[in-house]
């Protein structure tokens, strides 16, 4: 377990220490659960009262939220971002085992970089290129001619199909599948003809893919996820989707084929984006939204129906079916009023 002084942590995040600068810190914790060897954070002023009761050794706070109720603090402009950087320093996630397991199968034509780890029963197929300092967990499969950059981590059970391209410093969680066929079929006299999916998946640097998320390969062109994107668990990214830099997508979201998502977008959980439409930069889509047409202006968008009491929902559902008739009646009343005037 790593140990840092409060001053070292403050220097790391560009903050100012108030209190004992040599206080040793071993871990991060919440305000409620922290003990004297931990540092907590306050990112929302609504919870400032918790400073009165916390047992944390120190707290990361903004200058306006600092309080005499805590003896030691690091003052920063953005407490949440500072917490994230300190949490990275004090991360206790187990590191993958070093070296290449005896049970791993590596094709003779594969190129393996320096300091690469490959877990038990993993298969590295022909023509694969793996960059330096990359770790591939047990029971993974890397398909022919796929390229994986330096400093990547693939947890157990990741599958990457043929000819995909993965950048540097990517993190793929267990069960994620990259490069499976997109859903491409042509109707033919009541039957379906499969369209070979001949494109690739190209994932740029510093991308995180959540557990059991699937990213389909392109039909002819590539499916592309740009640098800095973060995608949560159990998402479906269909063929020929393009996601621009630093976009975040929460769990169970579906991006249909050939949609384009701009930079710095945030898409809430269980949302659905229609195929062949574009979403511009800096758009926030609330959870459970259904986006069926292009979004051309930055802002916040929502379309989900909030939960309500069952009886209320049934009444509103019945009224919803009457909307078209009510609209026609209102238009007729407006016409009659205009005629009378």
From Swiss-Prot:
Pathway in which the depicted protein is active: Bacterial outer membrane biogenesis; LPS lipid A biosynthesis
Active site: 239 (proton acceptor)
EC code(s) of this entry: 2.3.1.191
Reactions the enzyme catalyzes: a UDP-3-O-[(3R)-3-hydroxyacyl]-alpha-D-glucosamine + a (3R)-hydroxyacyl-[ACP] = a UDP-2-N,3-O-bis[(3R)-3-hydroxyacyl]-alpha-D-glucosamine + holo-[ACP] + H(+)
The entry's keywords: Acyltransferase, Lipid A biosynthesis, Lipid biosynthesis, Lipid metabolism, Repeat, Transferase
Gene Ontology molecular function, alphabetical: N-acyltransferase activity
GO BP terms: lipid A biosynthetic process
InterPro entries: Hexapep, LpxD, Trimer_LpxA-like_sf, UDP_GlcNAc_AcTrfase_non-rep
A cellular component annotation (GO) from this entry: membrane
Coiled-coil ranges per UniProt: none
Pfam families per record: Hexapep (PF00132), LpxD (PF04613)
Class of the enzyme per the UniProt entry, highest EC level: transferase
UniProt family annotation: Belongs to the transferase hexapeptide repeat family. LpxD subfamily.
Subunit and partners: Homotrimer.
Function: Catalyzes the N-acylation of UDP-3-O-acylglucosamine using 3-hydroxyacyl-ACP as the acyl donor. Is involved in the biosynthesis of lipid A, a phosphorylated glycolipid that anchors the lipopolysaccharide to the outer membrane of the cell.
Name of the featured protein: UDP-3-O-acylglucosamine N-acyltransferase
Organism: Idiomarina loihiensis (strain ATCC BAA-735 / DSM 15497 / L2-TR)
Lineage of the organism: Bacteria, Pseudomonadati, Pseudomonadota, Gammaproteobacteria, Alteromonadales
């Amino acid at each position: 377990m790593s140990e840092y002084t409060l001053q070292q942590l403050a220097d790391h995040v560009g903050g100012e220490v108030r209190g004992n600068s040599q206080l040793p810190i071993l871990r991060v914790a919440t305000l409620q659960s922290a003990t004297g060897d931990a540092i907590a954070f306050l990112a929302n002023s609504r919870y400032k009262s918790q400073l009165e009761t916390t047992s944390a050794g120190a707290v990361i706070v903004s200058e306006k939220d600092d309080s005499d109720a805590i003896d030691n603090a690091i003052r920063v402009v953005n407490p949440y971002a500072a917490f994230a950087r300190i949490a990275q320093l004090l991360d206790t996630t187990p590191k993958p085992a070093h070296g290449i397991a005896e049970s791993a199968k590596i094709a003779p034509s594969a190129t393996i970089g320096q300091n690469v780890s490959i877990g038990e029963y993993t298969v590295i197929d022909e023509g694969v290129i793996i960059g330096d300092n990359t770790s591939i967990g047990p029971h993974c499969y890397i398909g022919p001619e796929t390229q994986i950059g330096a400093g990547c981590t693939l947890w157990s059970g990741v599958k990457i199909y043929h000819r995909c391209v993965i950048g540097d410093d990517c993190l793929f969680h267990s069960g994620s599948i990259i490069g499976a066929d997109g859903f491409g079929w042509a109707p033919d006299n009541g039957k379906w003809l499969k369209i070979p999916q001949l494109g690739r998946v190209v994932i740029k640097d510093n991308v995180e893919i959540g557990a059991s998320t699937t990213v389909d390969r392109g039909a002819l062109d590539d499916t592309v996820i740009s640098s800095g994107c973060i995608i949560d668990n159990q998402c479906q990214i269909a063929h020929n989707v393009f996601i621009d830099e630093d976009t975040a997508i929460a769990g169970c979201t579906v991006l249909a084929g050939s949609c384009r998502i701009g930079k710095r977008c945030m898409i809430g959980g269980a949302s659905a984006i229609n195929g062949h439409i574009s979403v511009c930069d800096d758009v926030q889509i609330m959870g459970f939204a259904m986006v069926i047409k292009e979004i051309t202006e930055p802002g916040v968008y929502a379309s989900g129906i909030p939960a309500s009491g069952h009886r209320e929902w049934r009444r509103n559902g019945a009224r919803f079916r009457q909307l078209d008739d009510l609209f026609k009646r209102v238009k007729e009343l407006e016409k009659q009023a205009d005629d009378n005037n």
